[in-house]
Design a protein with these regions (language model features):
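Interhelical loop and helix-boundary elements at the membrane-water interface
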Residues: 1-7, 38-57, 103-124, 162-186
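Intramembrane alpha-helical segments
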Residues: 2-79, 136, 157-167
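Extended hydrophobic alpha-helices typical of membrane-associated regions
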Residues: 132, 136-186
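Alpha-helical transmembrane segments
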Residues: 75-87, 143-150
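Membrane-embedded alpha-helices of multi-pass transport/permease systems
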Residues: 89-108
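Multi-pass membrane catalytic core of lipid/isoprenoid biosynthesis enzymes
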Residues: 1-30, 86, 105-147
Length: 186
């Protein structure tokens, strides 16, 4: 435990050193992100929605990158952040399917457990919302034509995950989850 605390403290020190290179707004957001990062591990004990909290936490970097570049927060970045949250909610629910039995035994909560009878539908809704939000954002901001190929590939990767995903087969769940490396790259 002592070594882990030293390691975590070292990482926090280096992260803070990097953070102070940015503008004041980004620094404030970076410090605020610490609440999310430290609270996330406890969410599985508190709520069936830790994947939503992961989405809020993991995608906070989108807002920070925007503020680092523009020194402002705008509707566009909040919309992109929201789309990424739904995407994370979907893919982490797929990942969590592999752990349902063990999580139920030890009393850990997740969206995978909450929606286990309708998991494919829940993930589909999450991905659908992410796609609709992204299409709306890109069409409004850039004109859909500029991003048609990338958005189409992203959409197809999410649809492929839904097709590949089988809650009764851990290997298929992991394969579907790993597709998100490609989806995120897009």
């Amino acid at each position: 435990v002592k070594l882990a605390l030293v390691y975590a403290s070292s990482l926090c020190f280096f992260a803070f050193f990097i953070l102070i290179q940015f503008n004041v707004l980004t620094i404030i957001l970076g410090i605020a992100s610490m609440f999310l990062a430290f609270a996330y591990p406890f969410m599985k004990r508190i709520t069936y929605w830790p994947q939503l909290f992961l989405g809020l936490t993991f995608n906070w970097g989108i807002v920070m990158a925007w503020t680092a570049m523009t020194n402002s927060v705008s509707l566009e970045v909040i919309v992109l952040y929201t789309a990424a949250i739904f995407w994370t909610l979907g893919y982490d629910t797929i990942y969590g399917v592999q752990d349902i039995e063990d999580d139920e035994i030890i009393g850990i909560k997740s969206t995978s457990i909450k929606f286990k009878k309708n998991i494919k539908f829940f993930v589909s809704v999450c991905y659908f919302l992410s796609i609709v939000i992204l299409i709306g954002l890109f069409q409004d901001q850039f004109g859909l034509n500029n991003f048609t190929i990338l958005v189409t590939i992203f959409i197809l990767s999410l649809i492929y995950q839904i097709i590949k995903f089988n809650k009764s087969n851990s290997k298929k769940c992991l394969q579907a989850f790993k597709i998100n490396n490609f989806s995120g790259f897009i």
